[in-house]
Curated annotation (Swiss-Prot):
Species in which this protein is naturally found: Rattus norvegicus (Rat)
Protein name: Cell adhesion molecule 3
Annotated InterPro entries: CD80_C2-set, Ig-like_dom, Ig-like_dom_sf, Ig-like_fold, Ig_sub, Ig_sub2, Ig_V-set, Neurexin-like
Domain Ig-like C2-type: 128-226, 231-313
Pfam families linked to this entry: C2-set_2, Ig_3, V-set
Length: 396
């Protein structure tokens, strides 16, 4: 019976000594800090806090155990290290222009009984240098293989390299990592190979560095490549639909790298060539029906030749309106406009006369000395007009 009764006592003792059980009684005099990451050349702030300072001051020391600040008092003469805040419950300092050598564990201490400490691990990121591309020597011929190398030094931790050509991602080999002589940073390198086409002529191959210290900023280098390829050509007529009697230019538009240096024009069924020149246009000063046929233009460079063909069909001359008919049309338009204006004037004149209606008798009668008789005569005259049967004439 003794063994079972001792089991609860053993469990209670185990719980009291467990690490979790220790958290049940929090030490208010224990300071706390946080780890920090900073880019080389930047500024880091170290913050130490304590709840119960027990009338003691906080202190910061560097990885070499050199005291930096004791309370608000500077202990190490380093202008990069400045006091940010000093209270009984907090001591914060800043380190500017951080170097790789500043990396390590910084200690915050409070001199209670016993002395309590907290650690802050400062990680310094090395910024990678701008990458360098090597391996490109001169122009490449179409379908040859281009091999480029890219290298960047000074990153910590080691950076990653990526390739692209224009908007297209290129898959280079795995990034190679080598430690720099300072023992802290790394040099990374990568290579890429691809077969070039004529579309790659003038393209930019870009090597970019990916690293957390850049915070999304672009750090890259580009290499423009030149590709030599055989020419192509096409024939463009001017005008597009030539007619008999017109002047015609057949433009032979050659493209290539290098551009064609010579153009040879031929017409099927005729010998020798019509034209051999460095100029690309074939000129017909005055087209005839006999000029119809198939023409070929051969564009030549030191990379090869290409022949384009064009079938010319000379259309009948278009009827040209005579100058006299054009003149007559203009005169007719002017006459029609004048007649239209006269009609408008006649309409307005008629409207005016209707609104101001009067007769000779009316005006003469009103101008006589015997006004009453004149009015009577006017009334009688109007009455005679309305009567229709009894028409009388009065002389005044």
């Amino acid at each position: 019976m003794g063994a079972p009764s001792a089991l609860p006592l053993l469990l209670l003792l185990a719980c009291s000594w467990a690490p979790g059980g220790a958290n049940l009684s929090q030490d208010d005099s224990q300071p706390w800090t946080s780890d920090e990451t900073v880019v080389a050349g930047g500024t880091v702030v170290l913050k130490c806090q304590v709840k119960d300072h027990e009338d003691s001051s906080l202190q910061w020391s560097n990885p070499a155990q050199q005291t930096l600040y004791f309370g608000e008092k500077r202990a190490l003469r380093d202008n990069r290290i400045q006091l940010v805040s000093s209270t009984p419950h907090e001591l914060s300092i800043s380190i500017s222009n951080v170097a790789l050598a500043d990396e390590g564990e910084y200690t915050c201490s409070i001199f209670t009984m016993p002395v309590r400490t907290a650690k802050s691990l400062v990680t310094v990121l090395g910024i990678p240098q701008k990458p360098i591309i090597t391996g490109y020597k001169s122009s490449l011929r179409e379908k040859e293989t281009a091999t480029l190398n890219c290298q960047s030094s000074g990153s910590k931790p080691a950076a990653q390299l990526a390739w692209r050509k224009g908007d297209q991602e290129l898959h280079g080999d795995q990034t190679r990592i080598q430690e720099d002589p300072n023992g802290k940073t790394f040099t990374v390198s990568s290579s890429v190979s691809f077969q070039v086409t004529r579309d790659d002529d003038g393209a930019n191959v870009v090597c970019s560095v990916n690293h957390e210290s850049l915070k999304g900023a672009d750090r890259s280098t580009s290499q423009r490549i030149e590709v030599l390829y055989t020419p192509t050509a096409m024939i463009r007529p001017e005008p597009a639909h030539p007619r008999e009697g017109q002047k015609l230019l057949l433009h032979c538009e050659g493209r290539g790298n290098p551009v064609p240096q010579q153009y040879v024009w031929v017409k099927e069924g005729s010998e020798p060539p019509l034209k051999m020149t460095q100029e690309s246009a074939l000129i017909f000063p005055f087209l005839n029906k006999s000029d119809s046929g198939t023409y070929g233009c051969t564009a030549t460079s030191n990379m090869g030749s290409y022949t384009a063909y064009f079938t010319l069909n000379v259309n009948d001359p278009s009827p040209v309106p005579s100058s006299s008919s054009t003149y007559h049309a203009i005169i007719g338009g002017i006459v029609a406009f004048i007649v239209f204006l006269l009609l408008i004037l006649l309409i307005f004149l008629g409207h005016y006369l209707i609104r101001h209606k009067g007769t000779y008798l009316t005006h003469e009668a009103k101008g006589s000395d015997d006004a009453p008789d004149a009015d009577t005569a006017i009334i009688n005259a109007e009455g005679g007009q309305s009567g229709g049967d009894d028409k009388k004439e009065y002389f005044i």
